[in-house]
Amino acid sequence: MTYIPTTAAEQQQMLAACGAHRMEELFSDVPASVRLGRELNLPRPMAEAEVWRHLEELAGKNKKLVSFLGAGAYEHYIPSVVGHLLARSEFYTAYTPYQPEISQGTLQAIFEFQSLICELTGLDVATASHYDGATAMAEAALVACNATRRQKILVSRSVNPQYRTVLSTYAKGQGVELAEVPLQDGRTDLEALEKLAGKDVAGVILQNPNFFGQIEAMAEATDLAHKARALGIAVVDPVSLGLLAAPGEYGADLAVGEGQSLGNPLNFGGPYLGFIAAREKLVRRLPGRIVGQTKDVDGKRAYVLTLQAREQHIRREKATSNICSNEALCALAATIYLAAMGREGLKEVASQCLLKAHYAQKKLAALPGVTPVFNGPFFHEFVLQTKLSPATVARRLAENGFAAGFDLGRFYPELKNALLFTVTEVRTREEIDALVAAMRGILA
């Protein structure tokens, strides 16, 4: 065991303390039949320079594709200041504090995150963050059930299918009934929603922009929810709020979403960042942590964890949620991103997403064999249909250096051969034109 920095004399002292003479005696209870009995078949050790060269060779095998994929996870530009500040040891190594008032810096960072989410959504209070957008939506549904004392949730079919799957998992354990609202031309059918919104409904969930990128009639849908004395729950893309109306403006009671777009890379699927914002009347029903601002005994500003109705602090059956952690580091990244971009910066990002997506949609829809599926207004995602299977299109595009065309038929059988394209501010006109040229060649 040469990798352990002990001398032979020190090893003998430790063996003597164990009542052994040789190292092998420590493993005497391991049958000989299961022992290896030979040296490990490992290559020779490498010098540091050799390791770097080997890793570069492995990295060189990766395929770098220009991405036009989205469907809930988006590639946005991240200012360098985000990574620089995030990597500071004061933040990077700190878990959510168990003696919170000692960690005033961490609590202030979370407080700033909550404040920014409230400003984005136009609502009164936000939590310290959640695991991801899907769990945030499911938790909001439980808030609606607790607040109204009803056990039925209406959720539009235009909401991200993976979010709906997580919601279904939550609902089974809580005895919550789910009903899906059908679609009309890629958006929630408001007439169907009005018929479904009865006196037993606790909440109505819509996504804006929805999974197809379409802009929903959120004000009308929220009004229908309120007529049934249910809560209106909006699932939003935070970047889109640089241009679109905030949930608070159209009367939503709760706003949830995925914060990955705010300064967090794609990370091969995680960790991501869920957020929940709500009206003040719901503050005591919110899950997880909330950081509040107060004054200490000397009258100085101080931050505390407040309203911790979590299963770790009270009787489990009385808790509002089993959520017992958050995504503080990812929330810090979102906070730094929003502070760096500012109001006008976020508006510029949203504007570029909108303009570039419409440019790409116009170019692609003009190709022979390509048909736009929906005609409503959209933000930065759109749906096109081709004569080829989505798998064929995706494979051929990958051969041309593009990751594009999410297969909607996976979740919507009626959308066979329909592809979801996403364009964010990081894509250039040249990349969009190259995608169009590649599609033209594939469909020829």
Curated annotation (Swiss-Prot):
Entry's EC annotation: 1.4.4.2
Protein name from the UniProt record: Probable glycine dehydrogenase (decarboxylating) subunit 1
Molecular function GO labels: glycine dehydrogenase (decarboxylating) activity
HAMAP family assigned: GcvPA
Free-text function comment from the UniProt entry: The glycine cleavage system catalyzes the degradation of glycine. The P protein binds the alpha-amino group of glycine through its pyridoxal phosphate cofactor; CO(2) is released and the remaining methylamine moiety is then transferred to the lipoamide cofactor of the H protein.
Entry coiled-coil feature ranges: none
Oligomer status and interactors: The glycine cleavage system is composed of four proteins: P, T, L and H. In this organism, the P 'protein' is a heterodimer of two subunits.
Catalysed reactions, as listed in the record: N(6)-[(R)-lipoyl]-L-lysyl-[glycine-cleavage complex H protein] + glycine + H(+) = N(6)-[(R)-S(8)-aminomethyldihydrolipoyl]-L-lysyl-[glycine-cleavage complex H protein] + CO2
Pfam families in alphabetical order: GDC-P
Gene: gcvPA
